[in-house]
Structures are given as C-alpha cells and as structure tokens.
C-alpha cells in the first residue's frame, strides 16, 4: 500500500471519539470480515480493542493513548463505552469483543486449502501450547504456526531481532500478542514496522479462552454489561482493576460525560449552518466554518486527504465553527496522526471557549497544540515533530 493510499484509507474511516479515543463505527461481523480480508490480501492492520480500563489508562499515558490513535481499526470492547456513546448520541452500534471476533474468524472462515495462520506471542507459561493443541484438533481452517513465551523480559529483550525474525519466518497471517495491555501495545508499536505479519493485535484473553484455562462468560452476561463480575469470579486478581475502573467511570460521568451531554443538547438547538472551508496557500491554513458534524464531512475529508498528501497543511483555523461532534474530533485526531507520520506538526487556532470546553469533555484538549488568539508573531510554521 502506498503512502497516499494509507492516508486516504485512514481519513475515510467512520470514526467517533469516546473518552479521548477514536473508535470505528462498526459491528462484530463487519470487523470479522475486515480482518479476514486484510489477512488474505496481506494488507497491514493494527487492530486494537479498548475497554473501559484501556480508555481510563490512556488518559494519563500519552504513549498508550497514541498506540490506539495509531491503530488501523479500533473497536469498543466494553459495554460501558457503548453506554457512554449512546448517552452522547454517538452511533457505535454494539460492543465488539476481540475474543468474539477471533472466534468468528475460527468458525466462519472455511478454506482448508488456504488456512489462516496464527502465531501467539506471550501469555502464561504453557497456555499458548495448550491453545495450539485445541486449535489443531477443531478441524477449522485455522492453524497455529508458532507460539512464543518471552516471560518477563525487558522491552528490548522481547524486541530482539532474532525474535522478530522467528515470527516472520512463520509466514503468519495473524499475530496475537498477550503481554498485558500497556506492554503489548508498546511492543506492537515498537516492532510492527519490522514484522511481516499483516494483522497484529493485542488480545490477551484470547489465548486463555482458547486454551480453556479461563472460561468466557455466557453471551447474555456479556451483553448485559456484567462480564466484569464473571471475570472476577474466574480471576480474583482482577478485583482491584475493576474497583478502580468503577470509581473512575463514576467520576468521568459526573465531570465529563453528563456535562458533555448537556452541552451537546444546547448545541442541537442552534440553527443548522452548512460546513464551509477554504485553504490559504500563503500560510498553509485551512479555515473551517459552520457545522463540523458527521453528515457534512465528506468533502472536507477529500480536501484533507489531498492537503496531507501534498504536505501543505500546517494550521486549522476554527474561528467560524458553529458546532462540532465526535466524528469531527476523531477526524482531527487522524489528521494529526497522518501529519505527524509525515514528520510535521499541526496547530489548531481560534477555538472558542465553548468548543474548547467540548474538547475538554471529550478528553482530547491535551492532544492538540491549540492557540486561542494567534498574533502575527506566533510561529505557525510546518515544523518537524520532536522525536
């Protein structure tokens, strides 16, 4: 895939920001089909499945957060995230659990002449080997072509070129990492450019579920949002994590989600204004005015794709903005991501107090360089990002 194709694919995604992270608006079936297609076409896909704990942790860990933004496909693997989305009018259709997607791939892909090749990296000692045995006898069109248990080594030790070489030699289609969410995402970010495996994902629970060392909750419990109780019953060590997440969720609701909903309701009463944008070549500034909401973003996406491909955009001026939604915020996150990949940085200017508050409620105000009232002496040049 060319750089131009990668930019276009990323910015055309239907993504919405929830708790500071951009989520693809997709279903479990669509995700399954997308991953199978990527594996068969050998197209790179970094697949990430944040749950509530993931989202809360990401708010205080920029490296962890960026691993989600840098992903190619992001799904909401937790009912609390779906509840938050519905509260804010964000159309995430359903929870998409990574372990459920893996099972769908096992059950729905039927081509024994071209099996999907999987390699496991991580997990408790012996668990990956047991998962290998289970998959080997289930007569599915999937085969495990390697499993590695790096133990508790350092990131450098787990990223040794010899380990990467061994993984690449498996000729796998899917790499499942199980190192704990933060370490797993960090390891993927550090090594994915050197890995030849097209689809890579941290799915820590999958190895345990396949091996049978941990039982998955019944479907009705998963859909009710009470899977955390089942997980505590199965793994008592998770109690502290869920206790922390529960407290953080209540605080988020009181200080971010409820005020965000109230603000969105007030904005919904404003008259609708068409989205307009223009580009100033002399300052490489894109000016946006009107309603930056999902239904109006198609032409803007096309313009942004062209500007990023040509490395012309350095500033987005939001002075004339009337209202915005989670789709526009997510688009800005992807725009900044692609500009950073090109070695440059993005600045947002003239964001008024209402929209700045909306950025705060959406947990993204610290993700952007925002200049409220730029003066002629402000440096808004397209400067290289700091590594």
Predicted feature locations:
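N-terminal nucleotide/polyanion-binding subdomain common to many enzyme families
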Residues: 2-100
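Short glycine-rich anion-binding loops that position phosphate/pyrophosphate groups of nucleotides
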Residues: 51-54, 179-184, 206, 320-321
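A transmembrane-helix-recognition feature enriched in membrane-embedded lipid enzymes
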Residues: 80-87, 216-217, 221-265
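Conserved beta-alpha
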Residues: 85-162, 166, 170
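Short Gly/Thr/Asp-enriched flexible loops that form oxyanion-binding sites at enzyme active sites
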Residues: 132, 185-194, 331-335
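Short, flexible loop segments at boundaries between secondary-structure elements
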Residues: 149-156, 196-232
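Proline-aspartate-enriched helix->loop->beta-strand connector
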Residues: 167-181, 197
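STAS-like cytosolic regulatory interaction modules
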Residues: 260-322, 334-387
């Amino acid at each position: 895939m060319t750089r131009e194709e990668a930019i276009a694919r990323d910015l055309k995604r239907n993504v919405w920001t929830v708790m500071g992270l951009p989520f693809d608006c997709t279903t479990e079936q669509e995700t399954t089909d997308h991953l199978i297609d990527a594996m068969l076409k050998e197209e790179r896909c970094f697949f990430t499945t944040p749950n509530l704990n993931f989202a809360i942790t990401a708010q205080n860990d920029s490296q962890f957060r960026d691993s989600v933004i840098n992903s190619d496909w992001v799904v909401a693997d937790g009912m609390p995230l779906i509840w938050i989305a519905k509260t804010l009018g964000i159309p995430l259709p359903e929870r998409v659990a990574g372990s459920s997607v893996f099972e769908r791939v096992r059950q729905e892909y039927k081509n024994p002449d071209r099996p999907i090749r999987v390699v496991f990296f991580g997990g408790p000692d012996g668990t990956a080997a047991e998962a290998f045995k289970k998959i080997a006898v289930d007569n599915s069109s999937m085969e495990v072509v390697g499993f590695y248990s790096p133990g508790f080594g350092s990131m450098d030790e787990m990223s040794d070129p010899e380990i990467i070489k061994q993984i690449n030699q498996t000729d796998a289609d899917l790499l499942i990492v199980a190192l704990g969410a933060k370490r797993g995402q960090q390891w993927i970010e550090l090594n994915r450019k050197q890995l030849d495996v097209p689809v890579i994902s941290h799915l820590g629970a999958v190895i345990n579920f396949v091996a049978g060392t941990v039982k998955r909750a019944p479907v009705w419990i998963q859909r009710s949002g009470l899977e955390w109780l089942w997980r505590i019953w199965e793994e008592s060590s998770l109690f502290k994590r869920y206790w922390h997440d529960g407290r953080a969720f209540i605080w988020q609701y009181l200080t971010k989600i409820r005020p965000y909903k109230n603000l969105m309701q007030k904005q919904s009463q404003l008259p609708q204004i068409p989205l307009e944008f223009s580009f100033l070549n002399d300052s490489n500034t894109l000016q946006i005015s009107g309603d930056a909401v999902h239904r109006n973003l198609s032409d803007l996406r096309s313009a942004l794709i062209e500007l990023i491909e040509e490395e012309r955009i350095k500033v987005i001026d939001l002075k004339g903005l009337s209202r915005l939604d989670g789709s526009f915020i997510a688009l800005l996150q992807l725009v900044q991501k692609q500009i950073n990949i090109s070695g440059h940085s993005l600045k947002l200017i003239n964001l008024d107090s209402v929209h700045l508050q909306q950025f705060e409620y959406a947990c993204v105000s610290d993700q952007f360089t925002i200049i409220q009232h730029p003066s002629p002496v402000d440096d808004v040049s397209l400067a290289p990002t700091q590594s």
